Amino acid sequence: MSVDEKPDSPMYVYESTVHCTNILLGLNDQRKKDILCDVTLIVERKEFRAHRAVLAACSEYFWQALVGQTKNDLVVSLPEEVTARGFGPLLQFAYTAKLLLSRENIREVIRCAEFLRMHNLEDSCFSFLQTQLLNSEDGLFVCRKDAACQRPHEDCENSAGEEEDEEEETMDSETAKMACPRDQMLPEPISFEAAAIPVAEKEEALLPEPDVPTDTKESSEKDALTQYPRYKKYQLACTKNVYNASSHSTSGFASTFREDNSSNSLKPGLARGQIKSEPPSEENEEESITLCLSGDEPDAKDRAGDVEMDRKQPSPAPTPTAPAGAACLERSRSVASPSCLRSLFSITKSVELSGLPSTSQQHFARSPACPFDKGITQGDLKTDYTPFTGNYGQPHVGQKEVSNFTMGSPLRGPGLEALCKQEGELDRRSVIFSSSACDQVSTSVHSYSGVSSLDKDLSEPVPKGLWVGAGQSLPSSQAYSHGGLMADHLPGRMRPNTSCPVPIKVCPRSPPLETRTRTSSSCSSYSYAEDGSGGSPCSLPLCEFSSSPCSQGARFLATEHQEPGLMGDGMYNQVRPQIKCEQSYGTNSSDESGSFSEADSESCPVQDRGQEVKLPFPVDQITDLPRNDFQMMIKMHKLTSEQLEFIHDVRRRSKNRIAAQRCRKRKLDCIQNLECEIRKLVCEKEKLLSERNQLKACMGELLDNFSCLSQEVCRDIQSPEQIQALHRYCPVLRPMDLPTASSINPAPLGAEQNIAASQCAVGENVPCCLEPGAAPPGPPWAPSNTSENCTSGRRLEGTDPGTFSERGPPLEPRSQTVTVDFCQEMTDKCTTDEQPRKDYT
């Protein structure tokens, strides 16, 4: 069935997330091994082997040049506008979707991309450069330095010879020196080793740097602080033991490169204090690849050591380009709209070249870290910064003897937090572990998005050589001997590095250790470090930009160490990257909210991880797929026992986490139900209490009415027959043998006597009430107050007071109380017509 045909019944569509990446990996491997390559490109007397289909698909220029060519081994010589330095990264981009950029080759790459009409690259990467690197709002460094650098971890005794070795340049060294534009904005120190050009050419190529005063250092560093609520607790926990390493904190801005002249005068260039932060841009976030400047990191101390832009030797013939010092000064005076990269280069052409003395190079290894100022707010960062012309005070050393150029202090845009939060959900598990290239310390690099789940990763054993103190520079930015100068200044700690919306690949060129990384995109090669050897910030020297549409989150990759090739095409002689799978560490974490706890942020023991596990599918499928689909996926791939064990462990932990979440939810539901029941019972209790009070009030009113009626009945008694009749209907009122009613000991009028009087009234008015035998058992109740009223009424009428005395024995002491039950019983049995009585009274 054709793909375009519409089936009669619904069809199941499987979309692979790694197919595109696998195709590119296979083509790149074929190109490096010269398999099925059908075209040879000659650029500046260098040969590049490639496939026509790939070139034609990426470039309109090659489409027009190669379509219709039937020759088997076609040789195409590119015009002089295309340089090897600019074409090399573009060719690698065509096969890997990753563009390696540095300040040395940005200009040539842009020129070559325009000439070759690689519009996809321009729309993605260069739009990013325009909005991020050259935005006058953010105050990022725009000056170029043609002095490229070597790898920072080569032996010092061999660095001098490698500086002069101009004939062994390969594309490996080319890619090693091509750091991405993030080095212009990242707050981490960026290492620049001695260039591979003669000293005289260095003096013309290097840009003179401003001399920064130390009196504004503290204020600038204080302005660089950002406080983000998400990492508040993490900051407090991680800044406890980092102050002793502050003497090695340096910046990742090339604007603070400075030369130490005899006059120490201010040179053209953007001072560190003038660097401002870029407000977040909310439009075209997906089309224009915007890079988050680690905006939600705690402070400047936590920024040192995240990413290092490691560079190797440049081309033998350096291109003498003008510095952008004038542009920097102009940018420092005004806040203009983002300028284009091409306009920047046109401006820089008019600037005079300034020589840099080869006898000395100022290092900033003793730059203190920014103090953790809790009082500063993000609004403080939007103020204008004064030029930073301080001297970092490191001893002068010869340029030949120095393998590293260090940079100024870190600065970060406070407004970028919103941008990071918007892109955070795209990559919740972008936690990166890269192998350590630094002999002194082996640390781990973590990149956390705005909703990244650090608690997952901290729940796992923390790798050895944890985060160094805030003061630790990147290895290249330290003017240390290779024997281990920094070892005494690196307290272990962990810290977050925000995930960026731009896929960035950090490629270490460090020789000794195997790289162990993990990616956040399921469309690229996946690898997951489970051992503790992974990663110091020192091991992340190179930044690669990937404009692959399937790469949504920041992707920090540490590819295999690339060795120089033997041919011109050997510049990309890498080990073929294998298809790897993303791993979500800490899947047994109790929560996916990504929130920090102080226990998590302080859990920094040095522990080892297991071996790296490479999977042919993204790790998300392990936890997301249903049971049947998961088993089918396992059967489709040939997996080793180690991989199976890892897969089942991840799935088991995921199930445990889900079960724990459900259990917590059930408990919360039970608690809520109990709370509802308690509220209902409380309301019912209040209702019953109010009803009881109402009943008491009604009962009191009824007793008052009964008392009045009993008094009237006693007042109406005229003869013994009436008393007998009253006694027959109301046995509680017995005649008393007392001589006078006054001899009866009156009791205070109470509810019980009122009830008794009421019974008398009922007995006279209603002839059906109570038989003598129906009286409740117990001693007869002799009313005191009521009988007193009755006898007193009779005495007033002239009745003989001895009438009652002959009726029975003397009144014995009686109980003066009647229970409420008796009252209710009598009330139920006796009925009265109260309305006439009320009218009568």
Curated annotation (Swiss-Prot):
Phosphoserine PTM positions: 315, 521
Compositionally biased intervals (Polar residues): 584-598
Recorded consequence of changing residue 788 to K: In IMD60; uncertain significance; severely decreased localization in the nucleus; the mutant aggregates in the cytoplasm
Positions bearing the Glycyl lysine isopeptide (Lys-Gly) (interchain with G-Cter in SUMO2) cross-link: 382, 421
Main location group: cytoplasm
Post-translational modification: Phosphorylation at Ser-521 downstream of the PI-3K pathway promotes nuclear export. The reversible disulfide bond may provide a mechanism to regulate the activity in oxidative stress responses.
One cellular component term from this protein's GO annotations in UniProt: RNA polymerase II transcription regulator complex
Disease: Immunodeficiency 60 and autoimmunity: An autosomal dominant primary immunologic disorder characterized by intestinal inflammation, recurrent sino-pulmonary infections, impaired lymphocyte maturation, and variably decreased immunoglobulin production.
Main function: Transcriptional regulator that acts as a repressor or activator. Binds to Maf recognition elements (MARE). Plays an important role in coordinating transcription activation and repression by MAFK. Induces apoptosis in response to oxidative stress through repression of the antiapoptotic factor HMOX1. Positively regulates the nuclear import of actin. Is a key regulator of adaptive immunity, crucial for the maintenance of regulatory T-cell function and B-cell maturation.
Protein name as catalogued: Transcription regulator protein BACH2
Natural source organism: Homo sapiens (Human)
UniProt lineage: Eukaryota, Metazoa, Chordata, Craniata, Vertebrata
Gene name tied to this protein: BACH2
